Amino acid sequence: MGRIAIYVVALIFGFANVTARADEKKYGPGVTDTEIKIGNSIPYSGPASSFGTTGRAQAAYYRMVNDSGGVNGRKITLVSLDDGYSPPKAAENARRLVEQDEVLGIFGSLGTPANVAMQRYLNDRKVPQLFVFSGVARFRNPRTYPWTMGGDLAFVSETEAFARYILATQAAPKIGVLYQNDDFGKDHLTGLRQGLGANAAAIVKTASYEPTDATVDSQIIELERSGANVVLIVAIPKFAAQAIRKIHDIGWNPLKLLAYPGATIPGTLKPAGLEASVGVVTAEFVKVTGDPAWANDPEMLAFHNFIKSYAPDLDPNDKLTVFGYYNAAMVVALLKRCGDNLTRENVLDQATHLKNVSIPMLLPGITLNTTPDDYSAIKQMQLQRFDGTGWVLIGSIVGG
């Protein structure tokens, strides 16, 4: 009987140890009982400096979360570095964030060239590169880059929707395309061709530019001379503004479609001229600030309270502010799901198992959904048209 009693005690003790181990906290780099350190790379300077608004909005959102107790009792520390929209600088930033700052992961970095420059290094080191501000396909390719996931709408999906809109509204479309000469521009071209299908010959002229170019005036003149009556502008705000202004100045009046990364009123349409921008059509997946339809919406009211308390220097009517806000909210939602298992492996596992996750400021009906084989978290959008003062939604939610 003595041996049996000893065995039972040992068995109970063993189960207690298993339970204790199951409850143990698991931390990756940058995590303690009181802190979660994360990083990103943002173009606060250079040709895409207007995108710096997203980084400032993210930082402000994390301050708000920290003031409310943080995530599961831990405060978020964001190390946000300027890359000037330069791929070599972005690659340097990634190494610093991982090797010197020892962050848990890279969240909400902006720009296709910068994220491409960081991608292989981060995947080789098995560091999460999540909720990237870019819709290119290579950030939605789990087989090749399992540690990278986009955080907004796929560019191919946007221009497939544009193609359907063109075919529905233009009797005999002749399409000219201005695009940035990288994956950002080329993915949009791919989506346009796929969406047009048998009508792909309607693309009569394409013209590319480099982010280091001074202007895109000559490209716009080329497109106008092609006889195009539709123009798709796939450009960052600086060059999108130049394109819209030049179209207006030469008296050209095509249907103007603008890829959503450049569709910001303060960064693109105001510099181009609001009158020149009337009629511009883009895709959207977040609520439009200033739209009376959302005046009493709880999420919109919370957003404006956030601006007042934590980001008074940011323009609430700039969708880049909204982008930074919703992206940081995605990160916080993900970290909450991780509980006390804040390893890089679990962060990735949680990110690839999102189902109908609601995030503030996304349009009604749009939720986050991912699987280990599907890294496109946002799959739906709604088209909208600029009326001279703000955006007016067109039709209903599309995609899925």
Identify the meaning behind each predicted range.
Residues 88-92, 137-140, 145-250, 293-296, ...:
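Extracellular/periplasmic Venus flytrap/periplasmic-binding protein
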Residues 23-26, 35-37, 50-56, 67-141, ...:
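Beta-alpha junction/loop-to-helix N-cap segments that form part of ligand/metal-binding clefts
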Residues 1-36, 398-400:
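Short, low-complexity disordered leader/linker segments with a strong preference
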Residues 26-59, 81-88, 110-111, 178-186, ...:
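Extracytoplasmic "Venus flytrap"
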Residues 309-322, 332-391:
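Segments of small-molecule ligand-sensing domains
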Residues 83, 130-131, 137-140, 211-212, ...:
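Venus flytrap/periplasmic-binding-protein-like
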Residues 247-324, 394-399:
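Extracellular/periplasmic periplasmic-binding protein-like sensory domains
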